[in-house]
């Protein structure tokens, strides 16, 4: 059954209230799901690997053409996508690629969103098939995804490479959350290989040796403490997680690659 814009808005508000989450963030997630379901329903399904956040990795160089076709797929959900801008990703050191700035439109609901599509990422050992549970529907869609070890390896590499210059607190939060839920599922040998492969891809092969010293400096840095407090104020889901908590988790992850 197709939901009306008013029904979607109402359900989003209820979920936000129950989970103490920002309704606008949930609306972006819902609209991202509408795009991902179009990916799952398209002929390009096997060419895309979901990485997390708003980043999608495209294989075999089909990013621009396929994305333009995917956005026009009609699933009968009342959602359309308007591409406002297509640009090269220039502000991230981790990956080159294309950024799509678009509006997801459902009746009078207009939700701005960005989707980053990169190529050439290293996944160790390989992508996995993932059943993505939808936010408002009691069903899942099947997509290819990064495996846990590669996700953690990339986040750890980012934290170490940026060091005291890091302004992206989300990686610390993600490491804390992923370890809290999935630590027992981590294959340490795969994690080590994924970290080495990521460092090689990003030309930071010496990070493993430098990791303990970098971690100690990051742990004691007053500016990063302040940035984390700002992140907590902006995102209620992080309010109960201290800087010491995220550093403990990050150091734990770092110890697993030694």
Label for each model-derived stretch:
Residues 55:
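Catalytic metal-binding/acid-base residues of hydrolase active sites
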Residues 1-48, 58-258:
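Structured mid-to-C-terminal alpha-helical surface segments
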